[in-house]
């Protein structure tokens, strides 16, 4: 090994996000609400959302959610600034899996949250646009996929449930 991190909290398995959060020219490794420097040492640990659900590890992501030109970490029910401070949070929502996309044409993107078998669409400040909507067929749900599934020029939200894959329109309906 070139390096090995210390033990991270709340990690079962997961997929790290890689981004240069602090603009030092070196990428950081984002795992849930924890950020490692590129040498494996801990840069910061957030105090809230973790982007995980059930017995599944974190799948956080990096996006400029508030359009300030700086990367933000989206982790479950929380958006962190690049320095680890909380930018937006909705404690009434569970932790879960996220995706970020612009669904309504406004400058700020929206945040999809999949957790506990339900789907929410959130504004960039973590207020609820719609949801919760149960995933047909049951199951906890996995990481959402954003794509134009039906070729109408608008993004939809794809989510795997226990027994089927479901595509939600941007208003939360399923065709």
Explain the meaning of each model-derived region.
Residues 1-175:
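Extracytoplasmic/lumenal domain signature
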């Amino acid at each position: 090994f070139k390096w090995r991190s210390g033990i991270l909290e709340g990690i079962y398995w997961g997929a790290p996000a890689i981004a240069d959060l602090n603009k030092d020219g070196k990428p950081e490794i984002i795992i849930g609400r924890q950020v490692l420097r590129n040498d494996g040492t801990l840069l910061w640990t957030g105090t809230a959302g973790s982007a995980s659900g059930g017995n599944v590890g974190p799948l956080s992501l990096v996006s400029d959610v508030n359009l300030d030109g700086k990367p933000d970490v989206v982790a479950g029910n929380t958006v962190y600034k690049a320095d680890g401070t909380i930018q937006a949070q909705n404690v009434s929502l569970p932790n879960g899996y996220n995706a970020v996309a612009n669904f309504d044409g406004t400058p700020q993107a929206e945040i999809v949250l999949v957790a506990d078998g339900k789907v929410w669409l959130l504004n960039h400040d973590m207020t609820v646009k719609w949801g919760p909507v149960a995933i047909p067929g049951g199951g906890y749900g996995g990481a959402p996929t954003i794509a134009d599934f039906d070729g109408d020029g608008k993004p939809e939200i794809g989510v795997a449930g226990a027994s089927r894959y479901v595509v939600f329109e941007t208003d939360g309906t399923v065709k």
